[in-house]
Amino acid sequence: MTATAGRVLRQLTHDPRTIALLVIVPVLLITLLRYVFDGAPGTFDATGASLLGIFPLITMFLVTSIATLRERTTGTLERLLALPLGKGGLIAGYALAFGAVAVVQSALATAVSVWLLGLDVVGSPWLLLLVALLDALLGTALGLFVSAFAASEFQAVQFMPAVIFPQLLLCGLFTPREAMHPVLEAISNVLPMSYAVDGMNQVLQHPDITGDFVRDVAVVAGSALLVLCLGAITLRSRTP
């Protein structure tokens, strides 16, 4: 598992464009958002915390799904699965590697948002970092899972409108979930991104850890673990 993680990390260090997408792009997007709302800092506070979790989720989803698919199309996965490692260990290795990147990504985005851009949070910035990290890990898990159903990198990207966009629309970022049509609200209640946004809002509004925050974090973490298990089950050694 650690050998797989080390190999993936070494590959990433030789791909500066991917590193830029993972680490720099979320920071640039948060910075852009701050100056879009330059005349309304309260609006940045209200949306910035939520997007601090959403941006890492999206970037990790894209990079993980494409990177895993590339491993399969080049025959690397087939060779690795011939070893005694097993699918579960292989997925755990990928998750460990991209999880390490997620730590750097989330820490940098949180630090820039809070201490440089002035994101006003009532709770601890460390809790903000925790939710951002779990969101990035969820994006990693989703990327590993959907890569099993794509035959090309283009198809991997096509999963984004199906997997990410509905969650983005229903997570409560644009309107409170309780104000949605009852059917849409019910759907949003089972989508992990909804709890990611709720968790960020809990840190934004409350100085202490609340029961709702614990629930939100547990749902996001549990969803990531569940999707990782599904990814191990559906992992293919060859392109379908």
PLM regions and their residue ranges:
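Transmembrane helix-boundary elements of multi-pass transport/secretion proteins
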Residues: 3-78, 87-107, 113, 117-132, ...
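Transmembrane helix segments
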Residues: 32-40, 150-190, 194
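Hydrophobic alpha-helical transmembrane segments of polytopic membrane proteins
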Residues: 127-150, 168-171, 222-229
